[in-house]
Swiss-Prot record:
Highest taxon listed in the record's lineage: Bacteria
Membership in a protein family: Belongs to the UPF0111 family.
InterPro entries according to UniProt: DUF47 (IPR002727), PhoU-like_sf (IPR038078), Put_Phosphate_transp_reg (IPR018445)
Annotated protein name in UniProt: UPF0111 protein CT_691
Length: 224
């Protein structure tokens, strides 16, 4: 709690940004995780999945600490409700990453040439959507200093629009993946099919929550 008090003393957004870095540490493992799966290195998949779970637990603990600290009456120049919602959405991103990682340990899955390239494109766009909103949140303390006005605020609104566009691109890629999996020419076992569907849904959850987070940040800036 003393660490959080110090962070809040720097900026009301500093704890959110510290939490964001833990969330980012779960998202950033996804590419190495799926690369290990592609190579058939299931031992590394297990190690990386444990890493994601560890980082998610840390993020969850910090989220709870921030919530308690916000209830302590610390002065804030923005709505407590807004900050609580932002950190809750951020935490849901780490939850999605952990869910995906756990699914990869349920069964020794494999990539198929029919969807491998499309899948990594989908994953890349999804990570980009998160990185865009993360960039916005890292700017929030600077925006506070400038009363959310000027070029920085305009830049943030552009980034929010970028997240929305990336989420739409993710939706289109997800649709293309669905077409592959439901094609009459594509043969995959039932267990593998179910797991891949859940994995794709989990990845989609990251882009959806990134867009939701971007809009909430934008609303917070507009309310100021």
């Amino acid at each position: 709690m003393q660490v959080l008090a110090s962070l809040f003393g720097q900026s009301p957004f500093a704890p959110l940004q510290a939490h964001l870095e833990l969330v980012s540490s779960t998202i950033n493992v996804l590419f190495p995780l799926f690369s290990a799966l592609k190579e058939g290195d299931y031992e590394r998949v297990g190690v990386l999945a444990q890493l994601v779970s560890s980082k998610e637990r840390q993020a969850d603990g910090m989220k709870n600490d921030v919530r308690r600290h916000l209830a302590s009456g610390v002065f804030l120049p923005v709505s407590r409700a807004a900050l609580l919602e932002i950190i809750s959405i951020q935490d849901s991103l780490a939850d999605c990453a952990e869910d995906i990682a756990i699914l990869l340990t349920v069964k020794e899955l494999q990539f198929y040439p029919e969807f491998e390239e499309l899948f990594f494109e989908f994953l890349q766009k999804t990570v980009q959507s998160f990185e865009a909103v993360a960039k916005t949140i890292r700017e929030m303390d600077r925006l506070l200093e400038s009363s959310f006005g000027g070029n920085r605020a305009d830049k943030t609104r552009v980034l929010v629009s970028e997240v929305s566009n990336l989420e739409h691109e993710c939706d289109l890629l997800q649709r293309e993946l669905m077409k592959v999996f439901f094609s009459d020419d594509f043969a995959i076992g039932t267990k593998g099919f179910v797991l891949w569907m859940q994995i794709i849904k989990g990845i989609s959850g990251i882009s959806n929550n990134s867009e939701k987070l971007a809009y909430r940040v934008s609303m917070t800036l507009e309310e100021k």
